[in-house]
C-alpha cells in the first residue's frame, strides 16, 4: 500500500489535505498538460472545486489566467486567487468570443473543467491557431477545424509522483483550498447539497 500512499506534512490539516487527492491533483495535472512553459495566456473554463485550484497552480507557473464561469461568485473567487481577468460565460458563442478577442485576443491554451459540450466547443474556438486545449471533464468532443492545427488533450488524474508535487506546492506556496466540513453521518445530505450546487467547491466528511 506504500506504493500508492503520499506522505502529508504533520503541519497540514487533514481537512485541507483531503481535497488535494481529488480536486488538487486534477487541477495540477491539467495545468501541466497545458504546457505552461510554452503557453502563458491560459483560459480556465469552470471555476469550482477544481478550477479555483487550477487558477493558483497556473499562477505558480507565472501564467496570465483568464477565468470563465456562469456565476459571478465563482469569478470573484478566481479574481481573488490571482486571475488576471474574469468573464461571465455565455452560450451566445459569437458574442462571448467577440468580447474575449476584443479584451485579450486569442488564448494560448484553454482548460475545460465544466462538463458541458457548449463550453468545450467555445474553449476550442477561443484558442489561437496552433494552440492547446486540455479537457479535464467527461463529454462529447465537438468538431473542430483540422487546418487550425490545434491540439486537444485529455486529463483527469495523476500519478503518485504527481501527488507528491501537489502536496509540496500547496505546502510551500500556501495554495488556498475552498471546502466545507461536515460530520460523516450527514453524508447523504451532503451528496444532495453537492447535486443541488449548494456547496461552493468541495465537501469534506469528518468521522
Labelled PLM ranges:
Residues 1-45:
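NAD(P)H dinucleotide-binding glycine-rich loop of Rossmann-like/cofactor-binding domains
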Residues 23, 46-50, 138:
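Glycine-rich Rossmann-fold phosphate-binding loop(s) that bind the pyrophosphate
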Residues 41-47, 59-122:
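Adenosine-nucleotide cofactor-binding segment
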Residues 52-55:
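Residues forming the Rossmann-fold NAD(P)(H) cofactor-binding site
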Residues 121, 163-207:
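C-terminal hydrophobic helical "lid"/dimerization subdomain
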Residues 127-128:
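Helix-to-beta-strand junctions that scaffold the AdoMet/dcAdoMet cofactor pocket
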Residues 131-132:
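Glycine-centered, small-residue-biased loops immediately flanking beta-strands
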Residues 137-150, 155-168:
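Rossmann-fold NAD(P)-binding glycine/threonine-rich loop
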Amino acid at each position: 500500500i506504500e506504493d500508492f500512499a503520499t506522505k502529508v506534512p504533520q503541519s497540514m490539516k487533514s481537512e485541507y489535505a483531503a481535497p488535494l487527492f481529488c480536486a488538487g491533483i486534477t487541477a495540477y495535472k491539467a495545468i501541466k498538460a497545458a504546457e505552461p512553459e510554452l503557453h502563458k495566456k491560459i483560459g480556465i473554463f469552470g471555476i469550482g472545486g477544481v478550477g479555483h485550484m487550477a487558477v493558483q497552480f497556473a499562477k505558480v507557473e507565472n501564467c496570465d489566467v483568464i477565468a470563465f464561469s456562469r456565476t459571478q461568485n465563482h469569478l470573484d473567487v478566481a479574481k481573488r486567487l490571482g486571475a488576471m481577468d474574469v468573464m461571465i460565460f455565455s452560450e451566445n458563442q459569437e458574442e462571448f468570443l467577440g468580447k474575449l478577442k476584443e479584451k485579450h485576443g486569442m488564448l494560448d491554451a484553454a482548460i475545460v473543467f465544466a462538463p458541458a459540450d457548449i463550453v468545450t466547443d467555445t474553449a476550442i474556438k477561443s484558442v489561437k491557431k496552433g494552440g492547446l486545449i486540455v479537457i479535464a471533464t467527461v463529454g462529447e468532443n465537438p468538431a473542430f477545424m483540422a487546418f487550425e492545427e490545434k491540439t486537444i488533450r485529455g486529463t483527469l488524474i495523476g500519478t503518485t509522483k504527481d501527488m507528491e508535487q501537489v502536496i509540496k506546492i500547496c505546502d510551500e506556496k500556501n495554495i488556498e483550498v475552498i471546502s466545507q466540513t461536515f460530520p460523516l453521518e450527514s453524508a447523504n445530505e451532503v451528496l444532495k447539497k453537492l447535486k443541488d450546487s449548494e456547496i461552493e467547491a468541495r465537501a469534506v466528511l469528518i468521522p
